[in-house]
Amino acid sequence: VEGSLVQFETLIMKLAKRSGFFWYSFYGCYCGWGGHGLPQDPTDRCCFVHDCCYGKVTNCNPKTATYSYTEENDGIVCGGDDPCKKQVCECDRVAAMCFRDNKDTYDSDKYWKLPPQKCQEDPEPC
């Protein structure tokens, strides 16, 4: 794993104060690789929106593009001259803030390693 996925983990650590790999890799229908069905709770919706955001990125691979950002007032400001990499940074920044803002509804007992049959509904559009 390199590039943006490592940076995404860093942004989650900075903003949500927890490990993205540990807390969000196998959660709900959309957190982790792939995604199917309907988002199960607000945290899973963060991942759904992040997947949709990555799907709209053009001219670079969002999973490997390395972007630049600065930390300002306990927040993240995406920078750099490459519009594609800046878009990837914004996807990651918004998702990390979403994780932070939805910690109180995170339910590992209910949604951690959710069986695939729970994610069979027709997905909603991005």
From Swiss-Prot:
GO biological process terms, semicolon-separated: arachidonate secretion; lipid catabolic process; negative regulation of T cell proliferation; phospholipid metabolic process
Single GO molecular function: calcium ion binding
InterPro entries documented for this protein: PLipase_A2, PLipase_A2_Asp_AS, PLipase_A2_dom, PLipase_A2_dom_sf, PLipase_A2_His_AS
GO cellular component: extracellular region
Free-text comment on the cofactor: Binds 1 Ca(2+) ion per subunit.
Domain of life: Eukaryota
Expression by tissue: Expressed by the venom gland.
Entry EC no(s): 3.1.1.4
Name used for this protein in its record: Acidic phospholipase A2 S1E6-b
Organism: Calloselasma rhodostoma
